[in-house]
Design a protein with these regions (language model features):
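Extracytoplasmic metal-acquisition and chelation regions
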Residues: 1-258
Length: 258
């Protein structure tokens, strides 16, 4: 982890807001953390600005999820632009869930077990980058671990024995569903709007599974959500997997399923 410039030795960048939460919890006051993809932007198609490219080149670390669309599209250009910045795939060591056609679900942070792995990867990178602060980072990491463990306990208690299914437009809760034995019924088909036939088939499945909730993200709002909600008598609940407030968002999702 080299120092690009003298004035920027204590800055790092993350790709999305949930990673900023983890990074700030561990890095504390030793690093200033900035996020590349702003709130209410789509990380699948986001294009970094020239100012962000400059900020990245002056950062010591760049924490990525590793599977998000814009990360895959821009990875080579970002690394060429910031040769002295250490790029860290925080999902390293996580068993990915496939969505078909060789594409993995990128929402790895929407699982407490995965969040713990991602935080460990951050701790390792920060310790290598600034060895003199290793004990400081380790203490902060332990506190974050406790928060993650408490969140997991809370979610387990909330969802225990429910065996629920839920509808969702964009399949952002695959890891969440897997962790708590839930079934995710997805409206979107591999990034595309479903056909009338696909929509009807999903409605029939929903009538069998009897989900009570339909999760939606603001950036994916469209008429198919209303059609599905009316046809299946489900309650529409807005979620934000890209929220900085990771523990609160995880609990919000679980409470909606209670």
């Amino acid at each position: 982890c080299t120092s690009p410039t003298a004035k920027s030795t204590q800055t790092l960048m993350v790709s999305i807001e949930p990673l900023r939460y983890f990074a700030e919890e561990i890095a504390g006051n030793r690093f200033q953390v900035t996020t590349m993809v702003p709130q209410n932007s789509n990380p699948e198609t986001y294009e970094p600005t020239a100012q962000q490219m400059m900020a990245l080149s002056e950062s010591r670390l760049f924490f990525m999820v590793g599977e998000i669309g814009f990360e895959r599209t821009w990875a080579k250009r970002l690394q060429q632009n910031a040769p002295q910045t250490t790029f860290v795939n925080t999902s390293n060591g996580i068993k990915l869930i496939a969505h078909g056609h060789g594409i993995s679900d990128p929402h790895t942070w929407m699982s407490c077990r995965n969040a713990d792995i991602m935080a460990r990867n951050m701790l390792q990178a920060l310790t290598q980058c600034s060895p003199k602060d290793s004990s400081y980072f380790a203490k902060n990491f332990q506190r974050l671990q406790q928060t993650i463990a408490q969140t997991h306990q809370n979610l387990t208690a909330t969802l225990q024995g429910k065996h629920l299914s839920f509808l969702i437009y964009h399949p952002s809760l695959s890891y969440f569903a897997h962790e708590y034995g839930l079934q995710q019924l997805t409206i979107e088909e591999e990034g595309r709007e479903p056909s009338a036939l696909q929509l009807q088939q999903l409605i029939e499945i929903a009538h069998q599974r009897k989900p009570r909730v339909l999760f939606m993200q603001k950036e994916f709002a469209n008429r198919n959500i209303r059609v599905m909600a009316e046809s299946t008598h489900t309650k529409v609940v807005e979620i934000n997997p890209l929220s900085y407030q990771w523990p609160q968002e995880m609990r919000h999702i679980a409470q909606a399923l209670k």
